[in-house]
Amino acid sequence: MDAHDGEADELPPPPPVPANVVPIKADDVESEVPANKPAKPKRFPMARPGLGRKGQPIQLLANHYKVSVKSSEEYFFHYNVILKYEDDRPVDGKGVGRKVIDKLQQTYRSELSSKDFAYDGEKSLFTIGALPQVTNEFTVVLEDVSTGKTAANGSPGGNDSPGGSDRKRVRRPYQTKTFKVELCFAAKIPMNAIAQAIKGQESENSQEALRVLDIILRQHSAKQGCLLVRQSFFHNNPNNFVDLGGGVMGCRGFHSSFRGTQSGLSLNIDVSTTMIVKPGPVIDFLLANQKVDHPDRIDWQKAKRALKNLRIRTTPVNSEFKIIGLSDRNCNEQMFSLRQRNGNNGDVDEVEVTVYDYFVKNKGIELRYSGNLPCINVGKPKRPTYFPIELCSLIPLQRYTKALSTLQRSSLVEKSRQKPQERMSVLNDALRHSNYDSDPMLRASGISIAQNFTQVEGRVLQPPKLKAGNGEDIFPRNGRWNFNNKKLIQTCSVDKWAVVNFSARCDVRNLIRDLIRNASAKGIQMAEPFDVFEESPSLRRAPVSRRVDDMFEQIKSKLPGAPKFLLCLLPERKNCEVYGPWKRKCLAEFGIVTQCLAPQRVNDQYLLNLLLKINAKLGGINSLLQIEASPSIPLVSKTPTIILGMDVSHGQPGQSDRPSIAAVVSSRQWPLISKYRASVHTQSPKLEMMSSLFKPRGTEDDGLIRESLIDFYTSSGKRKPDHVIVFRDGVSESQFTQVINIELDQIIEACKFLDEKWSPKFTVIVAQKNHHTKFFQSGSPDNVPPGTVVDKQVCHPRNYDFYMCAHAGMIGTTRPTHYHVLHDEIGFSPDDLQELVHSLSYVYQRSTTAISVVAPICYAHLAAAQVGTFLKFEDMSDASSSQGGHTSVGSVPVPELPRLHEKVRSSMFFC
């Protein structure tokens, strides 16, 4: 699912950084390579050392369509596009660019040697072969361009048809609009670079050539009137819409992109979903968005934020505008100056009228309910243009870029499910309906697309055997296991604990009784709680900080000492407002392990899942890999090895100023690989590269890695790790060189800071979940079995990558995780590395199922999300200006997170 912010028609993502280029900021050039220090040799993603062989062979289909490319000595010519109005003002609207270029192509076809264009909608245009001139200047006239401009301030109907009395106040829409277009030669790209990319000989040219092909796909969809979101396109077809409530709809479309693979060039097509605003009357959207049943109950400040920058169509004149805000007063009170010609002497007088009177009396338009509501402003900040709200309707295919509610997310998942066979049918239909073979630019590029899925050879790895309590074995089946009649392998004792109840609905006594009974069955010694602390009903509407503080005052006044553990019953769902302040109080201020729950239907399975989390948080282990308990993991069990999981969590859509949160989890108590701890820092908003792995401050290092290394040393018999395995989540292919240069260098510096002579070996692996490759069993309606690994046919032609489906896809179509091995000094064989990755999907202590990505990455995501709630309730402006904040280059200060209490710093508090 596409969940990124962005304009409807924007540039494709930049191509991956070529092998001979490492991106750096211009400002950092001097500081990066000091005069007295030679530049470090740069690392590049490693080549594939071989293929895996372990596992049961399985024949699969992938949603890649093979592409044949005719050999060509031609070139793609790249031209920069400069668009201006007739008066030399730059054209800033994105939608008009394609219309202008299409008209240019029609008008000047002979002057352009009948060349076809590939235009990205912005500033880049490509042709096959050169245009007649290096610089080409044209004048283009578009008809029926409605500008929405007005002649003077305050007019309520810039595109209306005024009567004789106000004809000078409002111009009719321009019937034609003149543009100046300049096409300037920028570069040429050999088309045979595509063939080089397929052979694994990547260069800047090959990436640019593939980018041109992707731009052709986008242009092809744009000509069909689609909404474009990166490489995905969405048709205005109500059959593709699902109502999620709140005035939001899920819109199903398709992703399409060209990819170089081991078997040649392929077209990857997949189902994609984006969120759109429900089209129709503005008032209907606002009522649904705010969940109210009458316009009088609308919060107009919220409405203003929700409507800003959306586009509307007005009646009765059918003109389109962008909303910039709302009027300060209601429609029947909002005044503006109207110039009218005096019938007696022909002079022009100015009169003050309300927007309501203008439309009702001057225009003869009946307004049923707009009088007491604000107007829609479609003008400019200093030149407002107002329309009554009931004359405005939201146009289709406008992206909704704010965060979805929990209910909306659940609804989207429920309504977007597709079984594998259904998805295959939908994708094949999408390719046929796209009719790419008719595209003149693709034909001229020598591109021909097959109509069938690519056949792929996969392998199914055996699930790892697990160890439970009393030496019993667990044999997972279909990615699942259970603890029926078994105990946990290493249990904690819960003796100093209490229950905190913010909920008025829960039967606390029965919950405690059943929890203790289930704990005993799994080998956990759980005493009766010291007390149950009930929130006073009078505080339930109080500020959340007061509610949490009051609860801790109760605890301190009644308990003889600090509890080891607090069970917290939340008033509603888990992400309620109490959650963040409660976690912060427990983990940062008092060092108390806490487990929150919002029980609705409590049964023994629910309580077992709860106990798995409690046991892990308090230092226990629920199950171990048999090869971990032996220990016999190749290259891990015999040499001290630390495993790191790294992730950066960003603010949700609409929270662009919220700091990003970087988390590093690290294994402890080697030779175990099932126990972890976490370190978390804030960094600049939307910054994906980690900036806090190594942070020297005088004689100290305040970075994330130092804490992990010291904890490994103290928990592993005073051994320093000789091997460091890094799993990195959330980065794109264009950022791979930064991971193995900028981030890996920080980790190495952190090691050297502790011991100059210490030189561990590193393996760096990136895990990607947001890709569009899916696998299907030919002739079977089922998902691919858990343990399926693919490293042939559809993987990179040179680089070391593979796809892993470790989990059982119970609903919809399984999404494999795409692992990229960027760097491997340790020297794993392909089989050993794939087995390790597979095994790490079985050490997730929160559940009894294999998970879709290695546990260290899941833990890093959980840690970042949980500690991120510490900031959710702070005044960000105050936090940003406090002395505790740190400042990144060219940005505002970033608030620092409170440090975790030493009692819980090495715990699995995030579990």
Curated annotation (Swiss-Prot):
The keyword Transmembrane does not apply. GO terms for biological process: regulatory ncRNA-mediated gene silencing. Keywords: RNA-mediated gene silencing. GO terms for cellular component: cytoplasm; nucleus. Residues 1-51, 149-171 are annotated as: Disordered. It comes from the Eukaryota. Residues 565-872 form the Piwi domain. The keyword Manganese does not apply. One of its GO terms (molecular function) is RNA endonuclease activity. Residues 281-396 form the PAZ domain. It holds the Pfam family Piwi. Belongs to the argonaute family. Ago subfamily. Probably involved in the RNA silencing pathway. May bind to short RNAs such as microRNAs (miRNAs) or short interfering RNAs (siRNAs), and represses the translation of mRNAs which are complementary to them. This is Protein argonaute 4B. It comes from Oryza sativa subsp. japonica.
